[in-house]
Curated annotation (Swiss-Prot):
Transmembrane segments: none
Record's subunit section: Homodimer. Part of the ribosomal stalk of the 50S ribosomal subunit. Forms a multimeric L10(L12)X complex, where L10 forms an elongated spine to which 2 to 4 L12 dimers bind in a sequential fashion. Binds GTP-bound translation factors.
Gene Ontology CC: cytosolic large ribosomal subunit
Pfam family, one: Ribosomal_L12_N
InterPro entries to which the protein is assigned, alphabetical: Ribosomal_bL12, Ribosomal_bL12_C, Ribosomal_bL12_C/ClpS-like, Ribosomal_bL12_oligo, Ribosomal_bL12_oligo_N_sf
UniProt record similarity statement: Belongs to the bacterial ribosomal protein bL12 family.
GO MF annotation list: mRNA binding; structural constituent of ribosome
Name of the featured protein: Large ribosomal subunit protein bL12
Keyword annotations: Ribonucleoprotein, Ribosomal protein
Gene Ontology biological process: translation
Length: 126
């Protein structure tokens, strides 16, 4: 039997369908008694904990509630922030708690919170 080069093997694999590749992987696992799964690395498990310790940079600005007597002022501010029409802004305020804006920088989120709070709404940053 002629010995195949790595290049020839790679070319043959490149021409296979996904189903054929799946069958090849199973055959290699059976023949050599190995698993195709990558080994878990202990360092990778520590990375999410370190990421959680970092300060959050993007926030969702959520309108929690609006005082009944200040609802019109809150609707105006929500329209200004979101660019929504009158009906959409009213529906958002009436349906609180609802997210006003998602993935906003911290400074911008704080500014939005200040505006809505001054108008009579209650905002949480998530």
């Amino acid at each position: 039997m002629a010995k195949l080069t790595q290049e020839e093997i790679l070319e043959a694999i490149a021409g296979m369908t996904v189903l054929e590749l799946s069958e090849l992987v199973k055959a290699v696992e059976d023949k050599f008694g190995v698993k195709a799964a990558a080994p878990a690395v202990a360092v990778a498990a520590a990375a999410p904990a370190a990421a959680a310790a970092e300060e959050k940079t993007e926030f969702n600005v959520e309108l929690t509630s609006a005082a009944a007597d200040k609802k019109i002022a809150v609707i105006k501010v929500v329209r200004e922030i979101t660019g929504l029409g009158l009906k959409e802004a009213k529906d958002l305020v009436d349906g609180a708690p609802k997210v006003i804006k998602e993935n906003v920088a911290k400074a911008e989120a704080e500014e939005m919170k200040k505006k809505v709070t001054e108008a009579g709404g209650v905002v949480t940053l998530k």
